Amino acid sequence: MPGVIALNKPYGVLCQFSAHEAHPTLASLLDVPEYYPAGRLDTDSEGLLLLTNHGPWQARISQPRFGAEKTYWAQVEGDVGADALQALARGVTLGDFTTAPARVRRLADEETAVLWPRVPPIRVRKTVPDCWIELTIHEGKNRQVRRMTAHVGHPCLRLIRVAAAGVNLFDLGLAPGTWCALRADELPLLAAQARRQTQ
């Protein structure tokens, strides 16, 4: 039966099941034959990773042409001002491509208080302030969010995917390294597709 799994991927875990010499992989966290990641999450990024055993669902969740949004919380160097936020929202040229318009906002300290400590902790320079921003995109090019924040002068220190395809990590209450199975009707993008197919 087609299914979807939501995992809170910890920092340092490689987004594959096959063994790797240098990093732990998804196999160290879950044993789910026939399930594969719907999209990827860099080894040094954390947060929501969706996995499925259904090829069409995998495509619908991960491929930009279907418009599935992904939301990230990025801890960046410096005090991000209005100009940088507007540039990210409009889209920036990164050399090989120009990003589509994004939704972007500064996060308050009270919002990020829900986050878990990263292991190992990030390297913070005492003389340089940092802050958190939220970015929602629908593309997902290689290291896109990190490249975007660096382009506007704010290198990324920590990156967490908090939502994808209508699934919110905080709603699931998953601690790092834990996972849960989702029903199709809990994944809004797939539920909408199923409704269209039955009409």
Where do the model's predicted regions map?
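RNA pseudouridine synthases
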Residues: M1-Q199
